[in-house]
């Protein structure tokens, strides 16, 4: 187990912080992809410019 000198102000070790960051970024990319698909589908259905 890591000692307290390896912890940042969040209480996570560097490895834990990197893992959390990768999971967060995966979720962000998934959210952005769903948002883009939803906007494209809405634009195809009912264009808002034109």
Curated annotation (Swiss-Prot):
Alphabetical keyword list: Antenna complex, Bacteriochlorophyll, Cell inner membrane, Cell membrane, Chlorophyll, Chromophore, Light-harvesting polypeptide, Magnesium, Membrane, Metal-binding, Transmembrane, Transmembrane helix
Annotated membrane topology: Single-pass type II membrane protein
Sites where the protein binds a bacteriochlorophyll: 21, 39
Gene Ontology molecular function: bacteriochlorophyll binding; electron transporter, transferring electrons within the cyclic electron transport pathway of photosynthesis activity; metal ion binding
Cytoplasmic topology ranges: 2-22
One GO CC term, this protein: plasma membrane
Compartment annotation: Cell inner membrane
One biological process term in Gene Ontology: photosynthesis, light reaction
Transmembrane feature ranges: 23-45
InterPro entries on file: Antenna_a/b (IPR000066), Antenna_beta_CS (IPR023623), Antenna_beta_dom_sf (IPR023624), LHB-1/5 (IPR002362), Light-harvesting_complex (IPR035889)
Periplasmic side: 46-50
Primary subcellular site in the record, as a coarse category: membrane
Xref: SUPFAM superfamilies: Light-harvesting complex subunits
Subunit structure: The core complex is formed by different alpha and beta chains, binding bacteriochlorophyll molecules, and arranged most probably in tetrameric structures disposed around the reaction center. The non-pigmented gamma chains may constitute additional components.
Family recorded in the similarity comment: Belongs to the antenna complex beta subunit family.
Protein purpose: Antenna complexes are light-harvesting systems, which transfer the excitation energy to the reaction centers.
Record-given protein name: Light-harvesting protein B-870 beta chain
Gene encoding the protein: pufB
